[in-house]
Regions:
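Transmembrane helical cores of multi-pass secondary ion antiporters/exchangers
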Residues: 1-408, 412-415, 479, 483-486, ...
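Cytosolic C-terminal regulatory domains/tails of membrane transporters and channels
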Residues: 397-525
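Cys/His-rich, Zn2+-coordinating zinc-finger modules
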Residues: 524-545, 552, 567-610
Length: 610
């Protein structure tokens, strides 16, 4: 019962603190640590001992799996060089660097224990770095590298701590689980069974890898890495989910793992703080002086920060890869500095510290070092990361540019779908094809409207507002029918679910529109010859209006301008689509946005933006 009360209390504190931080715009990971430290000194809060097995077998597999599912395998592969340099090279360097510092300041600890604590504090934490990084809007490439580093560096550190772990064995186990789970998912159509498979996968992959063993000598057995197995399985299953799962299963898995990830991540930060009292009291009750312990903790923290910063700048030119435009430019030094500064440690550091054998000299001091580095990096680097990003003027992902790319990709998908529809609609007595074409075009129009200016309400916003009002009264009527008891509750539940699905789509569209509001879509290099052509600037023939709409007495939504002749016409979201008509009549390939603050272009021939 004591354990149940403790778990309920942890979840309750997590929910309350997260809700308060959301209202006050505060970083919940840092606040949870402070709350945990304060709670550890309250008399009515029970002692919480963080068992290594709980973290390594209970928390680490689902957290890594959830992160791997959301990590793009394409981006991971494109950034594999910096990821490997950080997750392997930096962890090894930090292990020996911190080990040398600890051994120099505390000679009685011995080289084995000194290197062990070096391996313990070496790996940064995926939860800390990406949760704060995404919240403040770090560049996507920086977040991708941090995610990839954090997925692999735990395995590297645990290899350094337990030299029997074999990374290649972990890869093999992960591949086996990907094949087995992928095969099962292709034949499982029920969402609940698919969800159960997803929940089972990280724990099964981790345990299977850790239980397998290959004898390397008479008294030694090598084990595959459970961490690597979970990461490999998660990356591949996440990458292949559009093929392996149906739509309902993908939506359910996405929502389930987001909820699990939120609860576990938040609980991790609270647990870190709750360790404070016992770790501090045990360390200062040893024979070492208070001054020596404090100097050792501060020196280790400084070493961790300095070694990481020095390594990322030293290897900066090794981080170069061809960018999306194929330029191969060296990343800005500001990106490099952020990578160096975003090296917060987390719960794995504390859990690994508890693996150090009890008979190790100065073990309590080593545990305090691990806690001090974890809390210090989270509070020092985590709290200052938003300020550092602002001072360096590092650009956040542009919502308007994202909306432009989203509209372009959706348009390409729609064109492919309409081509398939033409093949299917040979015999169509009920004119179903026309209905489908109209819905697809309206979906495309809505995507393009989100790129437009944020002034008057556009047709999609009007539709969302009106339809949401309708759904409210429709749901009210369904609830009235339910209260009469004349209709089976299964039927009522199905109708309510249908309304919920439609309303959730409207809410998603509105949230996306709010992210774009106030942003500016900037130009980027297109990938067709028409967009790449340098053209002399032309003056618009009718600034601020579509003369065709004026003549016909119709209303336009957004305006476009032909880059060859300067003709202003309305977009395809407008009723008359005069920009497309202009292209059909003149053969002019490229139009650009004529809205204030926008400089993107559209090629009618190749159907791409630039």
């Amino acid at each position: 019962m004591h354990t149940v009360v403790l778990l309920v209390g942890i979840v309750a504190v997590v929910v309350v603190v997260a809700a308060a931080c959301s209202k006050l715009d505060l970083p919940s990971p840092l606040v949870l640590i402070v709350v945990g430290v304060a709670g550890s000194y309250l008399p009515f809060v029970p002692d919480v001992t963080l068992e290594p097995e709980v973290v390594l077998f209970g928390l680490l597999p689902p957290l890594l799996y959830a992160a791997a599912l959301q990590t793009s395998l394409v981006d991971f592969n494109a950034n594999r060089r910096p990821i490997l340099l950080l997750s392997v090279g930096l962890v090894i360097l930090t292990t020996f660097g911190v080990g040398a510092v600890v051994h120099a300041l505390l000679p009685g600890v011995g080289w084995a224990a000194a290197l062990a604590i070096g391996a313990v504090v070496a790996p940064p934490d995926a939860v800390a770095a990406t949760s704060i990084g995404r919240r403040i809007g770090l560049p996507r490439r920086v977040v991708t590298i941090l995610e990839g580093e954090s997925l692999l560096n735990d395995a590297t550190a645990l290899v350094a701590l337990n030299t029997a772990i074999a990374a290649f064995g972990g890869v093999a186990v992960g591949l086996v689980f990907y094949v087995v789970i992928g095969f099962a998912r292709k034949h499982v159509t029920e969402t609940t069974l698919d969800t159960a498979l997803g929940l089972l996968t990280p724990f099964a992959a981790f345990v299977a890898a850790e239980e397998l063993g290959v004898p390397t000598s008479a008294d030694h057995v090598a084990h595959p890495s459970g961490v690597v197995a979970v990461v490999v399985a998660g990356l591949l299953l996440g990458h292949r989910s559009p093929v392996l799962q149906n739509a309902q299963s993908r939506i359910a898995e996405r929502l389930n793992w987001r909820s699990i990830q939120f609860l576990l991540e938040s609980a991790v930060f609270l647990l870190i703080g709750l360790q404070a009292r016992d770790i501090i009291s045990n360390a200062f009750s040893t024979e070492s002086s208070t001054t020596r312990i404090l100097v050792l903790c501060v020196a280790t923290l400084v070493s961790v920060v300095v070694i990481r910063m020095a390594w990322v700048f030293f290897s900066r030119y090794a981080l170069v890869r061809p960018g999306p435009d194929g330029s191969g430019k060296v990343p800005p030094w500001t990106y490099t500095f952020l990578l160096g500064w975003a090296g917060m440690r987390g719960v794995v550091t504390l859990a690994a510290a508890f693996i150090i054998p009890p008979e190790t000299p100065y073990r309590d001091v080593l545990l305090l070092i691990a806690f001090f580095v974890t809390a210090g990096t989270l509070l020092l680097q985590g709290a200052s990361l938003p300020w550092v990003a602002r001072r360096l003027r590092v650009p956040s992902p542009d919502p308007a540019a994202d909306a432009l790319l989203r509209a372009n990709v959706l348009h390409q998908a729609s064109q492919t779908g309409l081509a398939r529809l033409d093949e299917l609609a040979g015999d169509d007595p009920h004119d179903v094809a026309a209905t489908i074409r109209d819905r697809v075009r309206r979906r495309d129009f809505a995507a393009w409207e989100r790129v437009g200016p944020q002034g008057a309400e556009n047709p999609s916003e009007t539709y969302n507002r009106w339809r949401r009002e309708m759904i409210d009264v429709e749901r009210g009527r369904v609830l009235e029918v339910r209260s009469t008891g004349t209709v089976p509750h299964e039927v009522i539940d199905e109708v309510l679910a249908m309304l919920d699905v439609e309303e959730s789509m409207l809410d998603h569209s509105s949230a996306e529109r709010e992210r774009v509001r106030g942003a500016t879509a900037h130009a980027f290099e297109g990938d067709c010859d028409h967009l790449r052509q340098v053209r002399p600037p032309v003056e618009p023939d009718s600034p601020g209006e579509c003369t065709d709409c004026q003549r016909e007495g119709t209303t336009w939504v957004h305006l476009r301008m032909c880059v060859l002749c300067g003709h202003i016409a309305c977009c395809d979201s407008s009723p008359q689509r005069h920009a497309s008509v202009h292209h059909e009549h003149t053969g002019h390939e490229v139009m650009r946005s004529a809205e204030p603050g926008e400089d993107w272009r559209w090629c009618f021939v190749d159907q791409v933006t630039g």
